């Protein structure tokens, strides 16, 4: 007898081995029809898999998250089925599930076009309508090789070579099409009706730009049509907010083929960049950080000491001079430790906080570059706190409070807190890990933060806190971090004299709030859909005349605004063009300016201005001093 225990702890007995689908059928035909897969003793299996021992079983349906992911994975296989029917010479590579979707990498002699994508999607719908069963066959290794050799699927053969210890592999058959996978997959194509192919992009075999280029077809799939429609709306909203498009439309920056992965900042974009940097510089000053500046290029021997030369060299830009090897720094921490090492440091100097707007270079693959979000040259608000083990908790409390204020000023209040704990492979004693992890956890508790434990996600040398922003359309952006590091101070010989008169190693806390300024500005642009807060907007107010009769008064207004606020003038654009006022208002509105001041004869006679706020809000006519007070309050309130 086989005893099956269900999630409600009820039990069912069967005379012999029984499949997941059979168990579902014995419970009821409705459940059987909705069964995507099963979870046996916590392990996902196909609906056709047989249970031959007493076990706990959960029936997986499309309404379970695992069910949705299985649907997505099976949709990737369906892409393969459709592609091979339409383009028989295409070679299939891999088709995994990703967040909210899936993709399939394909080798083909020409790029797929939007018309190809539409044809593939249509063929997938036709295949789904055939309502065929997806058949799983566990197949001996030699037969798997034979199957793919006969079909000319060279990439599948390479993947088989990557698994020398596998004696048998799962082959999933979609009619004449076959794919290799660990599974599980849906039992029938009727589960795949709610899907959409979204785009095609380039990719590389094994993600390495030195390998052959592939094409990646992306798609999404859901259990319910409403979920798909909501997803499509989110994607459409994300496209409207795409920082690359807004960067062009608002004349902020561009990326040029002459320097891939680096940003050409235009005047308005550079104004935003300077605004973020100056704000963060004031944060340094107000919170006990000493700003430092390290060199861009450092000798190979330093990178050998830190371990980067062996483990990170492929991602570093290197050069040679006078028979010495150098590298552009991919991070700022070694330079800060070299600064710390100059002169004798005492326990009285700790915690010692260094901050730098350090430009770093990382040789990211071309295919991974993305606007100003993923670049090769970037500037970090990089800080390093040299402290003792006992000071970690308080420094983390201080850092979390500071980070929350900074994010709020930039328009983010929804933060996810994670503690990344010790990985399997690590250095240091268990006691030191216990103390460090406990300090991080207690710091979040003291800060009143709910947090998640990311088990095993810490670095090999220490745990860290990760701070992830949730933006206006629900996307997650991991920006802030504070990382405990007892290793690099030891590698580079950092010491301080303790209260006992002996030399000790400091702990280094690597910390960043915005991280890469380039990436953070990209996030800001998308968060605010280009309509940046008044204090950050590259142009805060435009002054528009109706006719030439108001030109001198408009110039007078602009001059006053540019000197209006203590220690800072407003960023003003004066538009005296001989164009219709409606045309000028529309043009400046499209540039997402916070305020537009319109001046006609009545306003000139009254010494006033007609104020239009962003979002086509008419605030009426007011004295110039009243407007200065209004915009000054906006800037002070960071809105």
From Swiss-Prot:
**Domain TGS as annotated: residue spans:** 1-61
Q: Which reaction does it catalyse?
A: tRNA(Thr) + L-threonine + ATP = L-threonyl-tRNA(Thr) + AMP + diphosphate + H(+)
Q: Does the keyword Zinc apply?
A: yes
UniProt cross-references to Gene3D superfamilies, sorted A to Z? 3.10.20.30, 3.30.54.20, Anticodon-binding domain (3.40.50.800), Bira Bifunctional Protein, Domain 2 (3.30.930.10), Threonyl-trna Synthetase, Chain A, domain 2 (3.30.980.10)
Q: Where does Zn(2+) bind?
A: 333, 384, 510
Q: Which Pfam families match?
A: HGTP_anticodon (PF03129), TGS (PF02824), tRNA-synt_2b (PF00587), tRNA_SAD (PF07973)
Task: Provide the E.C. number(s) assigned to this enzyme.
Answer: 6.1.1.3
- Cofactor(s) the record lists: Zn(2+)
Where in or outside the cell it occurs: the entry states: Cytoplasm
- Biological processes per GO annotation: threonyl-tRNA aminoacylation
Q: Name one GO molecular function term.
A: threonine-tRNA ligase activity
* An annotated GO cellular component: cytosol
The ranges of region (Catalytic) come to: 242-533
Where the protein is mainly located, per its record?
Answer: cytoplasm
PROSITE patterns the record matches: AA_TRNA_LIGASE_II, TGS
| Lineage top rank: taxon | Bacteria
User: Could you tell me what the cofactor note in this record states?
Assistant: Binds 1 zinc ion per subunit.
Q: Kindly state the subunit structure of this protein.
A: Homodimer.
User: What role does it play?
Assistant: Catalyzes the attachment of threonine to tRNA(Thr) in a two-step reaction: L-threonine is first activated by ATP to form Thr-AMP and then transferred to the acceptor end of tRNA(Thr). Also edits incorrectly charged L-seryl-tRNA(Thr).
The similarity annotation says: Belongs to the class-II aminoacyl-tRNA synthetase family.
| NCBIfam families xrefs | thrS
Which protein is depicted? Threonine--tRNA ligase
Q: Which organism is it from?
A: Paracidovorax citrulli (strain AAC00-1)
């Amino acid at each position: 007898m086989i005893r099956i225990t269900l999630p409600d702890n009820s039990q069912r007995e069967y005379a012999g081995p029984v499949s997941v689908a059979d168990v579902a059928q014995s419970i009821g035909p409705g459940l059987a029809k909705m069964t995507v897969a099963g979870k046996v003793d916590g392990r996902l299996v196909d609906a056709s898999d047989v249970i031959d021992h007493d076990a706990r079983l959960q029936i997986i349906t499309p309404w379970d998250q695992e069910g949705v992911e299985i649907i997505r994975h099976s949709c990737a296989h369906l892409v393969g089925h459709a592609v091979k029917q339409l383009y028989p010479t295409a070679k299939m590579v891999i088709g995994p599930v990703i967040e909210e979707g899936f993709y399939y990498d394909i080798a083909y002699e020409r790029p797929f076009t939007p018309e190809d994508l539409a044809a593939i999607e249509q063929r997938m719908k036709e295949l789904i309508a055939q309502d065929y069963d997806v058949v799983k066959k566990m197949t001996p290794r030699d037969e798997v090789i034979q199957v793919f050799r006969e079909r000319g699927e060279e990439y599948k053969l390479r993947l088989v070579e990557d698994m020398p210890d596998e004696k048998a592999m799962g082959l999933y058959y979609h009619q004449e099409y076959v794919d290799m996978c660990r599974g599980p997959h849906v039992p029938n194509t009727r589960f795949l009706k709610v899907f959409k192919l979204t785009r095609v992009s380039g990719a590389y075999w094994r993600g390495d730009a030195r390998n052959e280029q592939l094409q990646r077809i992306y798609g999404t799939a859901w259990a319910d049509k409403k979920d798909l429609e909501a997803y499509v709306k989110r994607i459409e909203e994300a496209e409207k907010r795409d920082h690359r498009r807004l960067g062009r439309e608002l004349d902020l920056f561009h990326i040029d083929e002459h320097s891939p992965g680096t940003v050409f900042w235009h005047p308005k974009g550079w104004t935003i960049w300077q605004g973020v940097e100056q704000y963060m510089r004031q944060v340094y000053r107000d919170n006990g950080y000493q700003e430092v500046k390290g060199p861009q290029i450092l000798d190979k021997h330093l990178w050998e000491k830190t371990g980067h030369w062996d483990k990170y060299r492929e991602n570093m830009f290197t050069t040679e001079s006078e028979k010495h090897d150098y590298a552009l720094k991919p991070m700022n921490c070694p330079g800060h430790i070299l600064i710390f090492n100059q002169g004798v440091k005492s326990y009285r100097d700790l915690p010692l906080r260094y901050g730098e707007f350090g430009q770093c270079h990382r040789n990211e693959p071309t295919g991974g570059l993305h606007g100003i979000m993923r670049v090769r040259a970037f500037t970090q608000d990089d800080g390093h706190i040299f402290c003792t083990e006992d000071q970690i908790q308080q420094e983390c409390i201080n850092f979390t409070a500071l980070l929350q204020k900074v994010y709020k000023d930039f328009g983010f209040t929804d933060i996810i807190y994670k503690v990344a704990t010790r990985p399997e492979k690590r250095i240091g004693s268990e006691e030191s890990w216990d103390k460090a992890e406990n300090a991080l956890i207690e710091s979040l508790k003291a800060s009143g933060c709910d947090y998640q434990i990311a088990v095993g996600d810490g670095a090999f040398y220490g745990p860290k806190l990760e701070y992830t922003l949730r933006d206006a359309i629900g996307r997650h952006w991991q920006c802030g971090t504070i990382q405990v590091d007892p290793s690099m101070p030891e590698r580079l010989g950092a010491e301080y004299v303790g209260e006992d008169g002996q030399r000790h190693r400091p702990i280094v806390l690597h910390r960043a709030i915005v991280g890469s300024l380039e990436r953070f500005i990209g996030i800001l642009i998308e968060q605010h859909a280009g309509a940046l807060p008044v204090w950050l907007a590259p142009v805060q107010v435009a002054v528009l005349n109706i006719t030439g009769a108001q030109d001198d008064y408009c110039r007078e207004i602009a001059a006053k605004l540019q000197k209006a606020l203590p220690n800072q003038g407003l960023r003003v654009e004066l538009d005296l063009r001989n164009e219709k006022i409606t045309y000028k208002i529309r043009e400046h509105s499209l540039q997402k300016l916070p305020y537009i001041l319109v001046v006609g004869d009545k306003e000139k006679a009254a010494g006033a201005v007609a104020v239009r706020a962003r979002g086509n809000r008419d605030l009426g006519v007011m004295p110039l001093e009243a407007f200065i007070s209004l915009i000054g309050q906006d800037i002070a309130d960071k809105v």
